[in-house]
Amino acid sequence: MCGRFVLTTPAQVIAEAFGVEPPADLAPRYNVAPGQPVAVVRVTRPGGGRTLDRLRWGLVPSWAKDRPRAVTLINARSDTASTKPAFRAAFRRHRCLVPASGFFEWQALPGGGRKQPWLFTLRGSGPFAMAGLWERWRPPEGPPLESCTILTTEPNELVAPVHDRMPVLLPEASWDEWLDPESRDPSRLQAMLVPLPAELMASRTVSTWVNDARHDDPRCIAPP
């Protein structure tokens, strides 16, 4: 799964990389956690341009009767998202990209009880795009809630020793088709949802300071 990630890339670099207007208030985030607002890139109408918007991490299906108290749908398995009731409508028409500079996974250590956090990034310093889905839920009263989830896949050789899932990292060549609301061919969309080759990524252990979701500062990515 993907339960925490980092977005410390400068706003102007994000804007240039993803083809969006520079966000005015994109502060560095060292420990993005479920339930928090996250930056997503999406195309909300056929033929429209890309926008960068803030959505709640933890998808609420449009048909939900009540807003869930717990944040549970933070991830969707890429092999079942197109058919599961919670995700299939979003898979057809509400796909997005979640920009990140890195993501965390926790490795269980011998003896049980303790886990070592790892940070996974691209080789180099550029941001990457995690494949996501978004939805708009309309409550009986008040404004609509827009939320998102991150798609996961089998791990590549770099992630596998640490965790049995990893987020889908989409190469730039796939972004246009993934974001296009008129892209409806499930086989073409499914073909994009594969592990990024391990040779394109890097990893290192980091401090257990990141374990606490209330911590959001450079110590989260510092060495142990």
Predicted regions and their residues:
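Short linear sequence motif anchored by a di-proline
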Residues: M1-P224
